[in-house]
């Protein structure tokens, strides 16, 4: 099971390729099952939504909730990679689950590099624009990451916070990844049991 909630060629497919390469080298090949992406499963949506609600109770309801996903070159979308569409569906399902109005919700894409166009809107530019608007309290979550890392802790919670506050925002709340919380571990347990249902 690849701990990636959505499919993308450079991530999930790369893992699958390595598994298949290993299988080619085996004289006796075991039965294998590759878990499906879980970006739209009730278990995942409920876990992320609960994390968001817990943050709202602790830090207050923001003027806007921003979901920042890892970016990818735009050409991947044009070539048929479903990643962008799966990010959009995750966002829609979370928005519906939390009953958030369109004007209080956005998705964006972070971590771009190189010169070619990537999926938009870009998170860094979005944070600056939101600070310049009448958005005083912004909450940001990175639902595409199962655990916090340099791209969430530094790029969003440090650099992103600074961009938003320096452009006029007053309060920036970073909502951590599920990490090893009870919700995070329960999610992985449920997903594993679902995949194993026909095997054990």
Q: Model-derived features: where do they sit?
A:
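Extended amphipathic ligand-handling, pore-lining, and cofactor/metal-binding catalytic surfaces
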Residues: 4-200
